[in-house]
A protein has these predicted regions:
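A beta-strand edge to alpha-helix "cap/lid" segment located at domain peripheries
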Residues: 19-54, 61-156
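Bacterial Sec-dependent N-terminal signal peptides
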Residues: 1-27
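Alpha-helix boundary/capping residues
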Residues: 11-13, 59, 83
Length: 156
């Protein structure tokens, strides 16, 4: 009887410990995600198509006001190639705030984004955007963007 009771107690403890999920430090994860976004912004200022694309998940969606949605990496690739082929195009952004899910596998960021385009005379037109990015944590611990939404801060 004592052996059975001891065996059941040990089994219960093992099951309880196995079901316990470590608490995610969402603040630390948010800081990591914000740094990933900053790194992505820096990558977007260089003509390295693959490095820029690596931040998106294969089935990501990009939504920009007044433009058709870009669904999937091939459509996003065409958009990025168009930007990289324009020497007068520059984009940058800075994350402002965000949140990480309690499970630590999803997050979103609110960001300020700026696109600068120079015309043939060299005059720069600056467009400011509010941006929402939704991220999914990968099995290897990296973050990939799954939804990217930009909206102009002012309407014409």
């Amino acid at each position: 009887m004592k052996t059975t009771t001891l065996f059941l107690a040990v089994c219960f403890c093992l099951v309880a410990l196995g079901c316990r999920q470590d608490k995610i430090d969402t603040k630390a994860e948010l800081e990591k995600l914000m740094q990933v976004s900053r790194d992505w912004s820096a990558a977007a200022s260089k003509p390295d198509l693959q490095k820029i694309l690596d931040y998106w998940e294969d089935d990501a969606v990009v939504i920009s006001a007044g433009e058709p949605d870009k669904k999937g990496k091939e459509a996003i690739k065409q958009m990025v190639e168009g930007s990289l082929n324009n020497p007068n195009f520059k984009i940058s952004w800075e994350p402002i705030s965000g949140e990480i899910s309690q499970s630590g596998d999803m997050g979103y960021l609110l960001e300020n984004s700026k696109i600068t385009v120079s015309d043939s005379s060299g005059t720069e037109q600056i467009m400011n955007f509010k941006r929402v990015t939704i991220w999914k944590k990968q099995k290897d611990g990296s973050w990939k963007n799954i939804v990217d939404v930009m909206s102009p801060t002012t309407l014409k």
